Each structure stands twice: as C-alpha cells, then as structure tokens.
Amino acid sequence: EQYAIVISQDCAENFAKHIKKFGAFSKMTLVNPEPIFAIVENGIPTFSQNAKENADDWQAVSIAQGNYWITHATQDLFQPQELRLHQRGGVDYDKGCYLGQEIIARLWFKASPKAWLHRVSEIGDLPNAGEKLEKIDVVNSIAMQNDEKGSFEALVVARPADLATVGLTVLGFPSALQQPVERAK
C-alpha cells in the first residue's frame, strides 16, 4: 500500500521528522519529496507533477470551496473541527487509536467547537496566513484579481458573532460544508 502526502515545502522537514517516530511500529518508508504543482482542472483545485500553472487560480478556487492549506505560519494553530475536517471525512470518530484522538473525541462528544471555518471577503489590506484580525484567525487569503477596490477573500476561523463586529462579509461554502459544525445531540 502506498500513500502520497501533499504538504507545503516549509512544513516538509518537520513532518518527516515527526512521522519517522511512528515508522518503528510499521513497515513505513518515506521517500524524498518530489515537486508538485497546484493546478485547477475542470474547476477543481488539484495537483500535478508536470503542469505548472498560476498558483493564484488554485488558491482562489480552493478558498471558494473551503479547501484550506496549512503552511508553517498556520501549523498547530487549529483543531480539526475548527477547520471542518470532520465534514470532509478527515477525522474518524469510531476508528481505533491515533495521535490526538483523545482531544478530538473530547471535543466531539463533550463539547462543540466555539469557532470554526468561514469564507469571508473584505475591502482592505490582504491579511497574511496566521494573522489575527481582532478575534479572528486567518487561515488563507487571496487578493481578488481584476478588482479596483483592493478586496480579498479569506478562510478564517472565528466565532460567528465575531465576524459581524469586524465587518467581514460572510460568503457561502459548498453544501458539504454547510452542515452544523457541532455534533447532533
């Protein structure tokens, strides 16, 4: 069995060091990273080992679909539920043992996230990934092309009430990400 992991270059070395600790318990082998390029194919953000395109297009489509990307500036800042990873099948609450499972389970079964991923727009300076806009954490952002007003779109983690106080316009997500973030009781 083989798995391909796409990770930002600035996180690759730390990820390799971390995952190698678990290699002692399995027949895992890490291979050297290969260059991979972000592309948009049929309106879907994906990756290619051959085609190199404008990364801005990939970022804009990714943000519109609620697909965030983690970089060194944002690693370790967010919990999986805050990024809606459970709505994408990225967290399995019934699976056996994995690193961080007790924290994930505690949040899922005993509490609900207080802040979670939203797609927003605003006119103003483009915030950087990992930056705070008052009580709102920026995951990713991109300047809107062909916009004379200087607006941007961003994925942010925030409490819904905090979004209104900053004046951000909340935009929609695809239907898969419009489900309640908390566990149904």
Predicted regions and their residues:
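Acidic, low-complexity central loop/insert segments
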Residues: E1-Y68
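Glycine-rich, small/acidic residue-mixed loop/short-helix segments
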Residues: V61, N67-W69, A73, L83-G90, ...
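Structural motif
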Residues: Q101-E102
